[in-house]
């Protein structure tokens, strides 16, 4: 749901500088970068995935951005497990500097925060 909301907001703003970066919390399933990027671009054309090469790298990335996640076994499901995670949007400038964390993910707030951020760049 978050990707859909962010993608809609970015399309509405239509700022050429806007780029969506998705950090996968499940490198075992999201192990094909090309397929994951194709899926992401359904939500926003200028989107790319970051997929950690191993659990240690993933832990480093999630610690840096204070992302909480947990693998939950689903014994009665064909999927086998699910990943529960915090739901945040991080605004990062072109130089990779952290700008702001957005935890209120209602559509109006996302749109407002993205406009403020993109206009400040």
Protein language model features and the residues they cover:
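Structural microenvironment flanking redox-active thiols in thiol-disulfide oxidoreductases
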Residues: 1-61
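Detector for Asparagine
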Residues: 14-15, 28-37, 66, 75, ...
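Thiol/disulfide oxidoreductase modules built on the thioredoxin-like
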Residues: 57-113
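Non-globular targeting/processing and membrane-anchoring segments
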Residues: 112-121
């Amino acid at each position: 749901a978050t990707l859909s909301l962010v993608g809609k907001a970015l399309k509405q703003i239509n700022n050429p500088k806007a780029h969506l970066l998705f950090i996968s919390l499940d490198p075992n399933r999201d192990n094909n970068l090309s397929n994951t990027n194709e899926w992401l671009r359904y939500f926003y054309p200028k989107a790319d995935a970051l997929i950690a090469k191993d659990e240690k790298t993933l832990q480093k990335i999630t610690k840096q951005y204070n992302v909480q996640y947990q693998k939950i076994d689903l014994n009665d499901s064909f999927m086998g497990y699910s990943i529960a995670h915090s739901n945040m949007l991080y605004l990062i400038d072109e130089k990779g500097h952290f700008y702001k964390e957005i935890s209120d993910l209602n559509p109006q707030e996302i749109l407002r925060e993205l406009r403020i951020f993109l206009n400040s760049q």
